[in-house]
Amino acid sequence: MPDSGLLYKEWRQNKVALVITILVFILGNPLSILNMYLIYQGCVTGKENWVGPCVFSVDYLNSSFISLFWIWGVVLAVSQLGIERSKSFFDFTLSLPYTRGQIFHAKFLTGGMVIVVPQLIGYVLSVLLIMLLKPDQAVYFHNYSLGMIIVSMLAYSLVMAGGALTGNSFAQLLVSFTVAISPFLLISLPVINLEILFGGSIDFIHGPVPKWVQYFIPIIYVDSKWAENSPYYLVIPAIMTIIFYIIGYISFVKMSNERNGYFFLWKPLNRPVQIIVIIIGIMGFGYFGFTASESFAGYLIGMGTGAVIGFLISYFAIYKKMKLL
């Protein structure tokens, strides 16, 4: 259990973000139900302006406030690591009489409690509200409400891991987003380029893929369609949350957090990542050039353009130190 002094410091330092997040998590779920109820009441009082029967349905796949809860996990992680480092508060934090492991645990516990507890409170309030309003049906309510807690923690732990590897907020967000779409970048994009080069279709990418495989792609949880499937699939983001937590913890403890402003805290990562960015730029723009011109010449021009853009982006993002706030 982290020291109470560290927990208090986290609260004081990130109080605005924490309070806003708590309020959003507590009120978001009940407000979603109230919004659906008001829409139903609007139908009842103005039937002549509506098509079809008036049905009070709590349908969480048809847009709700809680569909964006994962964003607040991102906001908390950036506030706790990226912004703190950019404002040069991190040197003070590391000078406190605590180990780096204790500091990371305090940050993660604070963020985790703010994500989990208020959402559980909002869930209980929503259950009571449903019992009071008695909707005709509640579609995916329990699966989506409880699953969003896991999804929010996944977003939080992913961005915390990104922040433990990087030296500024921009780098933290960029690395986190790249990891979120990494299966596409590492598998689908190379296969698409191989199809262009060899002029044929590769069965691996177009053949049947088990449904559970897609849930290893973090970005997939931005779309609420995951709630339609078995709740057992939520074991996958729960496991990924633990993995990202471990990566973040090890990176925070082992790397030179004092190197404020740089893209990566560990310099040996710079060159390999730059090469990967250039390769992705070549493949991405090559595919775009081929689809735009439907010719191999367009593919080559796209590859050349991607190489230049990939080099420039990687050079200025990775090797140029950002000014501190």
UniProtKB/Swiss-Prot annotation:
One cellular-component annotation, GO: plasma membrane
Signals that turn on the gene: Negatively regulated by YtrA.
Membrane topology field: Multi-pass membrane protein
Keyword Repeat: no
Localization per record: Cell membrane
Entry annotated with the keyword Cell membrane: yes
Keywords tagged on the record: Cell membrane, Membrane, Transmembrane, Transmembrane helix, Transport
Residue spans crossing the bilayer: 16-36, 63-83, 113-133, 146-166, 179-199, 233-253, 272-292, 298-318
Family: Belongs to the ABC-5 integral membrane protein family.
Task of the protein: Part of the ABC transporter complex YtrBCDEF that plays a role in acetoin utilization during stationary phase and sporulation.
Assembly notes: The complex is composed of 2 ATP-binding proteins (YtrB and YtrE), 2 transmembrane proteins (YtrC and YtrD) and a solute-binding protein (YtrF).
Name of this chain's protein: Probable ABC transporter permease YtrD
Species annotation: Bacillus subtilis (strain 168)
Primary gene name: ytrD
